[in-house]
């Protein structure tokens, strides 16, 4: 039986309780990402970056300037992130789109049957999504130190990766994975447009970069500033209280509730903060007649570069 047949034979609808022991497979996912990135860097991203950045002037490839080397390095980083965010988005949608809670947030907390939060079981396919994302952020912590371009927001990025990994693990064990999967889908969709825009900027495709930035801004507004607070946070703040059996969970129920809502509202604050930065960038783009300026959100470098 081949690998594809083995994967198809797995019952991805099987349900079981989420436990810390499930994360024993995390190292496998954490090793998977640098392996795939290394192969893509060497055989795809490097060639694609040089082709798009040098264009038809391939005779200049032997005369790399420092600026072009930086662009190639950053292009490869954005290409890798784009591949991850796109694959994570596809995986998140494939896991959630046919679930009742994809369209009705009430089912974050009830079902199937008489299951109610936090005593719900988790399907194997949802566990796979969580291991996939947790593996990526575990790898990202080490990549930020040893692989990525050193940027001026290194400390913020490291704190973000560590906090995200902790939130993923805790939300999994505390049965917030249904909400978590939708939150992941909301975020990854915007990030795909961001990375496409950055790759276009590095390769000089200003129109594509501007169009991607517009899509990024629109998706940010719709998904993170409208849907996230008025549907997701409303459900985690109000709907969950209606379903929680306070007699059965008099202590851990409120602890989970306040802990995760605090983190989720902090995420909303970050969304608003980044939106202010993007608004300034959008105004500058209009003033510059559509030319996209540097990415104020995540690409302001204090160039202590790391070689690939």
UniProtKB/Swiss-Prot annotation:
It catalyses: (4R)-hydroxysphinganine + a fatty acyl-CoA = an N-acyl-(4R)-4-hydroxysphinganine + CoA + H(+); a sphingoid base + tetracosanoyl-CoA = an N-tetracosanoyl-sphingoid base + CoA + H(+); (4R)-hydroxysphinganine + hexadecanoyl-CoA = N-hexadecanoyl-(4R)-hydroxysphinganine + CoA + H(+); (4R)-hydroxysphinganine + octadecanoyl-CoA = N-octadecanoyl-(4R)-hydroxysphinganine + CoA + H(+). One of its GO terms (cellular component) is endoplasmic reticulum. Keywords: Endoplasmic reticulum, Lipid biosynthesis, Lipid metabolism, Membrane, Phosphoprotein, Transferase, Transmembrane, Transmembrane helix. Its main location: endoplasmic reticulum. It is a multi-pass membrane protein. Its EC number is 2.3.1.-. SMART domains: TLC. Residues 73-287 form the TLC domain. This is Ceramide synthase 1 LOH3. It comes from Arabidopsis thaliana (Mouse-ear cress). The lineage of its organism: Eukaryota, Viridiplantae, Streptophyta, Embryophyta, Tracheophyta. The gene is LOH3.
């Amino acid at each position: 039986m081949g690998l594809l047949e083995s994967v198809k034979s797995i019952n991805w609808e099987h349900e079981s309780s989420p436990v810390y022991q499930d994360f024993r497979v995390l190292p496998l996912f954490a090793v998977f990402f640098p392996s795939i990135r290394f192969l893509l860097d060497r055989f795809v991203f490097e060639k694609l970056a040089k082709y798009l950045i040098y264009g038809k002037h391939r005779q200049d490839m032997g005369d790399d300037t420092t600026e072009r080397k930086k662009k190639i390095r950053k292009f490869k980083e954005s290409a890798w992130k784009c591949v991850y965010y796109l694959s994570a988005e596809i995986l998140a949608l494939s896991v959630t789109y046919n679930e009742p809670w994809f369209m009705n947030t009430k089912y974050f907390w009830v079902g199937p049957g008489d299951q109610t939060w936090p005593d719900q079981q988790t399907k194997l396919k949802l566990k796979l999504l969580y291991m996939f994302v947790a593996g990526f952020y575990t790898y990202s912590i080490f990549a930020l130190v040893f692989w990525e371009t050193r940027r001026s927001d290194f400390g913020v990025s490291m704190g973000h990766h560590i906090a995200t990994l902790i939130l993923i693990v805790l939300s999994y064990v505390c049965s917030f994975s249904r909400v978590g999967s939708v939150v992941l889908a909301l975020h990854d969709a915007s990030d795909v447009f961001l990375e496409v825009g950055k790759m276009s900027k590095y390769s000089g495709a200003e129109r594509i970069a501007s169009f991607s930035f517009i899509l990024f801004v629109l998706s940010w507004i719709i998904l993170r500033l409208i849907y996230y607070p008025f549907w997701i946070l409303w459900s985690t703040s109000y709907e969950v209280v209606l379903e929680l059996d306070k007699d059965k969970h008099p202590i851990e129920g409120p602890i989970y509730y306040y802990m995760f809502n605090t983190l989720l509202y902090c995420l909303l604050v970050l969304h608003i903060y980044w939106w202010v930065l993007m608004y300034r960038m959008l105004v500058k783009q209009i003033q510059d007649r559509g030319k996209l300026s540097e990415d104020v959100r995540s690409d302001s470098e204090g160039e202590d570069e790391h070689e690939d």
